[in-house]
Amino acid sequence: MAPKITSELLRQLRQAMRNLEYVTEPIQAYIIPSGDAHQSEYIAPCDCRRAFVSGFDGSAGTAIVTEEHAAMWTDGRYFLQAAKQMDSNWTLMKMGLKDTPTQEDWLVSVLPEGSRVGVDPLIIPTDYWKKMAKVLRSAGHHLIPVKDNLVDKIWTDRPERPCKPLITLGLDYTGISWKDKVADLRLKMAERNVVWFVVTALDEIAWLFNLRGSDVEHNPVFFSYAILGLETIMLFIDGDRIDAPIVKEHLLLDLGLEAEYRIQVLPYKSILSELKILCASLSPREKVWVSDKASYAVSEAIPKDHRCCMPYTPICIAKAVKNSAESEGMRRAHIKDAVALCELFNWLEKEVPKGGVTEISAANKAEEFRRQQADFVDLSFPTISSTGPNGAIIHYAPVPETNRTLSLDEVYLIDSGAQYKDGTTDVTRTMHFGTPTAYEKECFTYVLKGHIAVSAAVFPTGTKGHLLDSFARSALWDSGLDYLHGTGHGVGSFLNVHEGPCGISYKTFSDEPLEAGMIVTDEPGYYEDGAFGIRIENVVLVVPVKTKYNFNNRGSLTFEPLTLVPIQTKMIDVDSLTDKECDWLNSYHLTCRDVIGKELQKQGRQEALEWLIRETQPISKQP
């Protein structure tokens, strides 16, 4: 993987930083975040500014360019990838390591006195702005909003913003109509004297209106904003896609609806001007809800006295708790996904010994089998298909320059998922097609122990995800090992594969308590640089569980695995498992055999069924 040569781009960007057509005064540093105007994790090609200017295209990272330096902050998932993709103009800042300075501290250390630091206010989150501005101000510097995005000014062949057709979802999939969702939100608004709710996150808008799109690859969302009032609904969206008959019928646009459910459709880019008009007529005590992750530009359009910022919006929290229709849809999606993976792993077992199966061809085969399933829409993220040392790159995606052939001598890791109309999947399995070494089995077994510890955990209602994170790491920690990513993230229902506010991690997104109906992943791992990667990932549903006692009547919760794909027993040091762990795995495999076996039989996939039966044989420790 040859790094991108960035010398000329950086020269042009630094020139733009001094160009008075774009800035009122020259700026001494420019911040280029990962996200778009909606702070999305996965973004459209037209918003890949950080990747364009640096070459690093991982989903998380922030670039900062000064007159003399170019630095990139990213987390442990991307250390190896970023190092390979960036040239010598860039300094990699490894977030989470004790010697790595924060972005603001680094700026203070390298900038001349009284510097101006610029950023596009439409793509910087409000919470980030506040933190950065405070530190810079205390050191005598200034954070400046730069209205014209400077990367756009030097990006001559920047792609157009997508504007693709919309998908409507009926009650069979959503369980609740968009009108009822609006009514529920208005009740919450009225309780708090909130008259307007500005919705900026793309998945929140899609969920609210029971619509999906395909403007961002693998994420069924569409570019839009929404403003919800107590008697008004405004949807900011471009193109004629809103005029499609099926969409007009779904949103009841042609019906003489009561005024409070009539949707006003406005141009996408008019959000700031319309918001300022609405705020101009607010009475003194009236409030406007907005996420603190909304862009600084949107937040600043609301007068400070009226602005009510929230870390998680009511939509974010409601969306995370799946209703029965959504939970059932997720179960159906995971059954179909397991069928596809049984087909894939059966195919790999036959083909890998012959030679010629590569990381890319294996990923393509996984997609081929998924496409055969009903209601398949797209993958849910680019498939991580990695063998040998590539497996140690946590978010590796194979490209022709790095494409390795699967062999009988290396560990193979595949992390993949799909968007079905009834649900979103995300599953990782690690396997060996020959004979794993004792060390590979040892590491795999530590990871499996952590996976089981989380999946089998029983915990009080109100427990936050970070309290479960150590369950996944305990066996690794006992041996002095660890991994540099969270243990689990929320998963959308035919929505983004990563969603808040719940998760299992030492990081801040796991601040919201887990509750019944939430769906998260359980994915501990271990990565040996230059050798292999191991990860075992299931999507799990939070469910109530009965316990012997019920302290303070608070109730208890546990997890139901939705992913039903065998875990390769060849990779396990069975004698290192406890009896409880053996029982858990045997029970899990029995469920895989019963549930997925029936579906394989129904679909006439006999070879894959035979593979499933072989892979779900009970394990037992040596007496």
UniProtKB/Swiss-Prot annotation:
A peptide binds at residues 77, 395, 489, 498, 523. It comes from the Eukaryota. GO terms for biological process: bradykinin catabolic process; negative regulation of programmed cell death; proteolysis. SUPFAM superfamilies: Creatinase/aminopeptidase, Creatinase/prolidase N-terminal domain. Keywords: Acetylation, Aminopeptidase, Cytoplasm, Hydrolase, Manganese, Metal-binding, Metalloprotease, Protease. GO terms for molecular function: manganese ion binding; metalloaminopeptidase activity. Belongs to the peptidase M24B family. This is Xaa-Pro aminopeptidase 1. It comes from Bos taurus. The gene is XPNPEP1.
